[in-house]
From Swiss-Prot:
GO MF: 3-isopropylmalate dehydratase activity; 4 iron, 4 sulfur cluster binding; metal ion binding
Protein's name in the database: 3-isopropylmalate dehydratase large subunit
Organism superkingdom: Archaea
UniProt keyword terms in alphabetical order: 4Fe-4S, Amino-acid biosynthesis, Branched-chain amino acid biosynthesis, Iron, Iron-sulfur, Leucine biosynthesis, Lyase, Metal-binding
Species name: Saccharolobus solfataricus (strain ATCC 35092 / DSM 1617 / JCM 11322 / P2) (Sulfolobus solfataricus)
Length: 416
């Protein structure tokens, strides 16, 4: 009789065609492969050097331009042109040029499904774990190999169980849950593990929040971070794509290396102070810190609920700090526009544009200067991440970011 399996074991058993356990080295079939402009150039280059320009299944490759969108310099334009030639010559159907948005948002909106194995040439591939996919970022050589063969090798991770109980307290979102895990366990604790997150009240913790937590799974050094598929997963995929997915869930009695419970109704707004994602503090510990610029967006927090929160806080007011707001995709931008959130942010003095990674990686569209303090809803705050090595980046959820932009200093949103 087969033992009860975790979600990780179920997915990787199916993908490898055999019964697997943590620690096993396996060859797994891949359901989806993806890359963006910054990494895609290297993936194609690896394939060219090996004289193996072929894709195992063109319908299973997704390409999106986001890091260099729109191209901030001539070299970026050349890179995008190189990838466009590949798309045209190979007849790749799932291609998103500079006018759509961030790769990871494209994946959860349109492609990722429960139980899939997804690889992409970017560390934040873990975002697709929000719908219950085993999603992992890899380097150019591994992605090229997966594109050619449709397979990859993996070490089956140890599964760690997280339970979310209760309803989120006021202004608490997925970012606070991610920061709590980072603060409580530190950034290297989950190396070699998969986090499997169970939500006791599924509709109280929506997909936007789950995507944020999954996105930051890589900051926890986890191999993958997956939410157990439930009625919220069904609701989201049906709303976005028009069909109900088949749910893959763990067996009752499945064994985990450990279990941790978070009481959502007892949480406080959290901030990761410079220069580490696990330097986590309650927001009131940092209250009054001057803020030069606020960034609301990225593949971490660029979804509709993030802009709803920001607009609710900013409505009828004016920002004191520079504020850049970037929805993660065309769809998120359009819906935020239709609901009036974009208008509210523009009226408050924010700069708003469509989906690009620009400021998050210190590439363009709002680079941090020396000595500046930045409050950002993005995923990383190490030195130099958003620009100057002398800038300080504070990571927060949308509520802390929005109220801090209005006040010109780090502020607890619970004052509202």
């Amino acid at each position: 009789m087969m033992s009860a399996k975790t979600l990780t074991e179920k997915i990787l058993s199916r993908a490898s065609g055999k019964d697997v356990s943590p620690g096993d080295v396996i060859e797994a079939k891949v359901d989806l492969v993806a890359f963006h402009d910054l990494t895609g150039y290297h993936v194609i280059e690896v394939m060219e050097k090996a004289n193996m320009i072929k894709v195992f299944d063109k319908s299973k490759l997704v390409i999106a331009f986001d890091h260099l969108a729109p191209p901030p310099d001539v070299r970026s334009a050349e890179i995008q042109g190189y990838i466009r030639k590949f798309v045209k010559s190979e007849g790749i159907p799932n291609f998103y040029d500079i006018n759509y948005g961030i790769l990871h948002e494209v994946m959860i909106e349109q492609y990722a499904n429960p139980g899939q194995v997804i690889l992409a040439a970017d560390s934040h591939t873990t975002t697709s774990g929000a719908v219950g996919a085993f999603a992992q970022g890899m380097g150019a050589s591994d992605i090229a190999a997966a594109l050619i063969t449709g397979k990859t090798w993996l070490v089956v991770p140890q599964p760690f169980k997280v339970v979310l109980e209760g309803k989120p307290a006021k202004w608490i979102t997925g970012k606070d849950v991610a920061l709590k895990l980072l603060g409580d366990f530190k950034a290297d604790y989950f190396n070699g593990m998969t986090l499997e997150i169970f939500v006791k009240d599924p509709l109280s913790f929506p997909m936007d929040y789950r995507a944020t937590v999954s996105n930051m799974g890589i900051e926890m050094n986890a191999d993958a971070l997956m939410f157990i598929p439930d009625q919220e997963t069904k609701r989201y995929i049906k709303e976005m794509r028009g069909y109900e997915p088949e749910l893959v869930t763990p067996d009752n009695g499945a064994k985990y290396v450990d279990e941790y419970t978070i009481q959502l109704d007892e949480m406080e707004p959290l901030v990761a102070a410079p220069h580490s994602v696990d330097n986590v503090k309650v927001v009131n510990e940092l209250e009054g810190t001057p803020v030069d610029q606020v960034y609301i967006g990225s593949c971490t927090n660029g979804r509709l609920s993030d802009f709803e929160i920001a607009a609710k806080i900013m409505k009828g007011k004016k920002v004191k700090s520079r504020c850049i707001a970037i929805p993660a995709s065309y769809r998120m931008f359009k819906e935020a526009l239709e609901r009036g959130y974009i208008q509210t942010l523009v009226d408050a003095g924010c700069i708003v544009t469509y989906g690009t990674c620009g400021p998050c990686l210190g590439g363009h569209f709002g680079i941090a200067g020396p000595g500046e303090n930045i409050v950002s809803t993005s995923s990383r705050n190490f030195k130099g991440r958003m620009g100057s090595n002398e800038a300080k980046v504070y990571l927060s959820g949308p509520a802390v970011a929005a109220i801090s932009a209005l006040e010109g200093k780090i502020t607890d949103p619970r004052v509202i």
